[in-house]
Design a protein with these regions (language model features):
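Parallel beta-helix/beta-solenoid
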Residues: 136, 143, 153, 158, ...
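Ser/Thr/Gly-rich low-complexity blocks that favor extended beta-strand/coil architectures
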Residues: 176, 182, 198-249, 392-428
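Short glycine/acidic-rich loop motifs that flank beta-strands on beta-rich extracellular proteins
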Residues: 118, 150-157, 177-182, 285-287, ...
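Sec-dependent signal peptide cleavage junction
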Residues: 21-42
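Small/polar beta-strand repeat architecture
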Residues: 234-285, 422-465, 473
Length: 661
């Protein structure tokens, strides 16, 4: 029976004294007790998690199969939800579970509504909606423009790991309180490294005991920094400072003691009047969307305003991921950072490609996007056609063609196709496997164990990835970190990033090779100001080189088939484009416009090339608005082989610098 009674309430006070109200969900009205909450006025700030009483635990494991109509399960918002902060967590979890159990069901939110949700076991949950072990195969969630607000700012939102064919669209996600706290320095004792901060009224995170628990531990030699400590960030400054302790001294002021290891930095940068943010460092593994070990995934028209850690994470995915019109931006009412401690998008070791279009990443503390494939360790060589391997770095399948690499030098030992995969030591083959090859790799020495050889599956490394019409701006990290195969980045904009706009590098923790890479018709302005002085100006806004951006001599050139064309580089801090350990590189039809004098950033050049071969630089325009470039094109003669420089236009003081040593 569908009830259609209407309730007229003259005021919020009247609403709160009513003993019961009608709640509307799944198209029917259900009698429920009114939640008892303390609702402060807007002048008194936002409501904290401690003021919310969860009264709907009986809805935690409901089966709403009988509410499905024409393949759609609709979750409607309570009429009083904006005032009562009704916790929809149990209802949404039950609705998702019902949709999973009824294949093909679409879960729809009410259009343009607001849903508050808490996890089952706060603060111990990793996600508000935990379905990582449900092995989902087919799920569609349509937000219809609604806003989902997480009541616990220390956890993520959706964990859909081990899933396939999942689509989420047209939904905004926020937290009631951001995963950081913001304020203004009102006093600073440089000798004691103690500051007083007047907090913005919207922030109440200092009241949460979980933050206090994440401060440093006490050891025999006194207080030491813990890697999980919160840390301070200063607006428009690249340094951060670890926090040892804090205490509230009034309703609006806190006193913060900084870690002595960062004291030498604070003397130069922290001043009274500075705007600072206290970041919850421990939540690096907390993401709004978690798609580890997953297949086909689609996210469309999603806005993320705040995240305790990062935005979207995936590991060892075997299917494609499509991201369209994803926005990770700060809510201007709640502070300056969108993602608290981790990357906007972080996908590693994926067999599938990533298609990303029309996305915006703004004011992220870490990188906007990481896509990379790792080498896997060969734990023991049994024979020229058989070895034991750690396979957690990338999902292997029979028929894959893999390379065996010598770590350190990057030397290619050999290539072969996988004939068979067998479980190793009782583990799944995507954790550890005995790898049988179709043909022998004769240079692989039998009997050697961990650390001598790595395997690499480059032909299944994000092959076919496309990133188009996206904007990356005002972040403290990098724009794109890519170690992939067959990737196109086109018509994107990179503005005012502390680090590189794009980085591809040979690195033990963030991938190894960038192959068949096209970077075309992009605009880059004012990036890389964090690293401009540590590398003598040779670190580029676009940087493709070896570990830690070094330009080292190597017989094996890691990156290959690189095209940089039709881009506009403006106002770069030290270098626009850095190329190292690359082969078959084309730099064509770009515009380089340097606006800073050389004495500002030690050594200014537009293009820097080292330890590479088969490089063509042609039909580019180099313009220096201020004199003093050390060479628009700068390269090392001893390590660059077969370089062609032709048909370029130079409107600068020095066109070319060849380093002889």
């Amino acid at each position: 029976m569908v009830l259609k009674e209407k309730i007229f309430v003259g005021s919020l006070a009247a609403l709160l004294v009513i003993s019961s109200v009608f709640t509307v969900f799944f198209g029917i009205r259900v009698w429920k007790p009114a939640p008892m909450v303390d609702i402060p006025s807007a002048e008194e700030g936002t409501v904290t998690l401690s003021s919310i009483k969860e009264t709907e635990t009986d809805y935690e494991n409901q089966d709403f199969s009988d509410k499905i109509k024409d393949g759609v399960l609709t979750l409607e918002a309570c009429g009083a939800e904006k005032d009562s902060l009704y916790n929809y967590g149990p209802l949404i979890r039950s609705a998702i579970r019902t949709a999973i159990q009824n294949a093909g069901t679409v879960l729809e939110f009410q259009a343009d509504a607001t849903y508050y949700a808490a996890p089952v076991d706060s603060p111990n949950s990793a996600a508000t909606f935990e379905f990582g072990e449900d092995e989902i195969d087919g799920l569609t969630i349509k937000g219809n423009g609604s806003r989902l607000i997480l009541l616990d700012n220390f956890v993520g939102c959706f964990n859909f790991s081990n899933s396939n064919n999942v689509t989420v669209e047209n939904l905004s996600i926020d937290t009631l309180e951001p995963p950081n706290a913001q304020g203004t320095v009102t006093a600073f004792d440089k000798e004691k490294q103690v500051m007083t901060v007047e907090t913005d009224r919207v922030y109440t995170m200092f009241d949460d005991p979980r933050l206090q628990e994440r401060l440093t531990t006490k050891e025999a030699n006194g207080t030491v920094r813990n890697k999980n400590n919160p840390y301070l960030l200063k607006e428009n400054c690249t340094n951060y400072y670890f926090v040892n302790s804090y205490k509230k001294i009034s309703d609006t002021e806190i006193q913060i003691m900084l870690d002595p290891q960062t004291a030498n930095l604070t003397n130069n940068y922290i001043e009274v009047g500075d705007k600072i943010t206290l970041n919850n460092r421990k939540n690096t593994s907390t993401f709004i969307f978690n798609f580890m070990y997953s297949g086909t995934t689609t996210l469309k028209d999603i806005t993320i305003y705040n995240s305790a850690g990062g935005g979207i994470v995936g590991l060892q995915n075997y299917g494609d991921m499509t991201l369209k019109n994803i926005q990770m931006i700060p809510d201007i009412r709640k502070g300056i950072w969108a993602c608290g401690t981790a990357d906007g998008v972080h996908i590693q070791a994926s067999r599938g490609k990533v298609i990303m279009e029309d996305c915006l990443f703004s004011h992220l503390v870490d990188d906007a996007m990481n896509l990379y494939q790792w080498y896997g360790d060969i734990s023991k060589v049994v024979s020229a056609t058989e070895f034991d391997a750690v396979t957690t770095t990338s999902p292997l399948q029979v028929g894959d063609t893999i390379e065996v690499i010598e770590p350190g030098t990057g030397r290619l030992v050999g290539t072969a196709k996988i004939k068979d995969l067998q479980p190793l030591n009782g583990q799944r083959v995507d954790r550890a496997a005995k790898v049988i090859l179709e043909t022998p790799i004769s240079d692989m020495q039998t009997g050697v164990e961990t650390g001598r050889y790595y395997w690499y599956n480059k032909d299944k490394s994000f092959v076919g990835t496309e990133i188009r019409n996206c904007t990356f701006q005002y972040g403290r990290g990098r724009g794109l970190v890519l170690c992939t195969t067959d990737t196109v980045v086109e018509n994107c904009t990179f503005t005012s990033l502390s680090n590189q706009a794009v980085q591809g590098w040979f690195n033990g923790t963030e991938g190894y090779e960038l192959q068949n890479f096209v970077f075309r018709n992009n605009t880059l302005t004012g990036c890389n100001y964090l690293t401009r002085e540590v590398d003598n100006g040779q670190n580029g806004m676009v940087q493709i080189s070896t570990n830690n951006n070094a330009y080292v001599q190597s017989t094996y050139l890691t990156h290959s088939k690189i095209e940089i064309s039709g881009n506009k580089f403006t106002d770069y801090h030290g270098c626009a484009l850095g190329i190292g350990n690359c082969r078959d590189v084309t730099i064509k039809n770009n515009v380089f416009n340097q606006k800073e004098a050389a004495n500002v950033y030690k050594k200014n050049n537009s293009v820097y090339i080292s330890n590479s071969q088969d490089v063509t630089v042609e039909d580019n325009r180099f313009q220096d608005d201020k004199p003093g470039l050390t060479g628009a094109i700068r390269y090392r003669a001893a390590s660059v082989r077969n370089i062609v420089i032709q048909n370029n236009t130079f409107a600068c003081e020095q066109a070319l610098e060849i380093i002889k040593e």
